[in-house]
């Protein structure tokens, strides 16, 4: 905060507390994030209209490998499970080669099939990229939120009621812009289970074809998901925490109250912003498309057009694909993160009271 008293904490201490919370949350919640991404990147039907141009935008292709002896055939990485799907060069399906990718019918089914066919470690695929992204991003985000909220309230730029909403939105906007390339990499690792060498080749191909701007593919829907999520989350969190705390002073809010308030707020915000999360996942899955079957990668459609397309192909239900794992993830992850952060702040507050800042 701007004016520190002996019981306050410094921005550096805020960053340490939030960074620790990010590590704990990532270790516990990455499996649910992997399942959510798999369900969202899965197409409505693996065997229907595979060659319709509108379906190519969400798929990633690779050129023929030694596994394909006949010229002109290609291996299609479909639905994020790396199971082969063979197509003739003219786009005609060849049933004699066709191997239907594993389909997930729900959250539990996805957990079981991923563990059975790919191993338990796959549930933590993308964890290194997740930690590299979330630890600094969370540290910046939470520290920026506290600093912005204190500034807005201190300067009377907005009411105390709406200060959390404004501060949360602004803090998240900056964070999304900085970490968007790493978010894209993490999504690719989780959805397609590719090696880091294959991922590097995919990123290099994308930069060659679309320039450095391609690394921010999905920034629009990510911002549309995360900025409103942040605004809704902090607004509801402060309200619920205040209601649960009652007459308890704000600086004495228990970790338990923070846990419950964070879980409730995360659940509400995640539900309202889920359609944008689906669009973000589908758009980022188009990274690395090449002309493996003489199909030129289509132009990137707008977020609203993709929302309409998903609804047309999969119905309203398609806009809420991965609802259960996202909610199951959002509630505990928000609860774990905010309670760990509040615990860390309380720890540093006690430490600073025993040894005042500046000594």
From Swiss-Prot:
Question: What does the UniProt entry say about where the protein is found?
Answer: Mitochondrion inner membrane
* Alphabetical UniProt keywords: 2Fe-2S, Heme biosynthesis, Iron, Iron-sulfur, Membrane, Metal-binding, Mitochondrion, Mitochondrion inner membrane, Repeat, Transmembrane, Transmembrane helix, Transport
Reactions catalysed: glutathione(in) = glutathione(out)
Q: Where are the Solcar repeats?
A: 9-151, 159-243, 253-347
**TM ranges:** 15-35, 122-142, 165-185, 215-235, 256-276, 318-338
Q: Which source organism?
A: Mus musculus
The reply on keyword Repeat is yes
* Expression sites by tissue: Abundant expression in bone marrow, spleen, testis and kidney.
Q: What coarse category fits the chief subcellular location reported for this protein? A: mitochondrion
- Knockout: what is the outcome? Embryonic lethality at dpc 13.5. Embryos are pale due to a severely anemic phenotype. Conditional deletion in the erythroid lineage also leads to severe anemia, characterized by a complete absence of Ter119(+) cells, iron overload and increased apoptosis in fetal liver cells. Cells lacking both Slc25a39 and Slc25a40 show defects in the activity and stability of proteins containing iron-sulfur clusters.
Regulation of its function: The activity of SLC25A39 is regulated by levels of mitochondrial glutathione via its ability to bind [2Fe-2S] iron-sulfur cluster. Upon physiological levels of mitochondrial glutathione, glutathione prevents iron-sulfur-binding to SLC25A39 promoting cleavage and degradation by AFG3L2. Upon depletion of mitochondrial glutathione, SLC25A39 binds iron-sulfur, preventing cleavage and degradation by AFG3L2.
Q: What is this protein called?
A: Mitochondrial glutathione transporter SLC25A39
Residues in the Mitochondrial intermembrane compartment per record: 1-14, 143-164, 236-255, 339-359
Binding of [2Fe-2S] cluster: at which residues? 74, 78, 88, 94
């Amino acid at each position: 905060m701007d004016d520190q008293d002996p019981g306050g904490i410094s921005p550096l201490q805020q960053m340490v507390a939030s960074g620790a919370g990010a590590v704990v949350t990532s270790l516990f919640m990455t499996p649910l994030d992997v399942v959510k991404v798999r369900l969202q990147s899965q197409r409505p039907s693996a065997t229907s209209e595979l060659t319709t141009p509108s379906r190519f935008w969400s798929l990633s292709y690779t050129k023929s490998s030694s596994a394909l002896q006949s010229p002109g055939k290609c291996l299609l990485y479909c639905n994020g499970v790396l199971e082969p799907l063979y197509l003739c060069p003219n786009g005609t399906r060849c049933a004699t080669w066709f191997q239907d990718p594993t389909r997930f019918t729900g959250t539990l089914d996805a957990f079981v099939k991923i563990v059975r066919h790919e191993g338990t470690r796959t549930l933590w695929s993308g964890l290194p990229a997740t930690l590299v992204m979330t630890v600094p991003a969370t540290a910046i985000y939470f520290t920026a939120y506290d600093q912005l909220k204190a500034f807005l309230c201190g300067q009377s730029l907005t009411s105390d009621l709406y200060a959390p909403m404004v501060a949360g939105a602004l803090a998240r906007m900056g964070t999304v812009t900085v970490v968007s390339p790493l978010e894209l990499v993490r999504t690719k690792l989780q959805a397609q289970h590719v090696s880091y060498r294959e991922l590097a080749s995919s990123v290099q191909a994308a930069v060659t074809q679309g320039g450095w701007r391609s690394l921010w593919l999905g920034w629009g829907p990510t911002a549309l998901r995360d900025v409103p999520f942040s605004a809704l989350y902090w607004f509801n969190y402060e309200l619920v925490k205040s209601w649960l705390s009652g007459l308890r002073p704000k600086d004495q809010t228990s970790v338990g109250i923070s846990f419950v308030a964070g879980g409730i707020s995360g659940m509400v915000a995640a539900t309202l912003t889920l359609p944008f999360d689906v669009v973000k996942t589908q758009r980022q899955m188009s990274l690395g498309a090449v002309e493996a079957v003489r199909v030129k990668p289509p132009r990137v459609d707008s977020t609203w057009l993709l929302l309409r397309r998903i609804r047309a192909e999969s119905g309203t239900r398609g806009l809420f694909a991965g609802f259960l794992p996202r909610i199951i993830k959002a509630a505990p992850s928000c609860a774990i993160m905010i309670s760990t952060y509040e615990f860390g702040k309380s720890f540093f507050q006690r430490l600073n009271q025993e040894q005042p800042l500046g000594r």
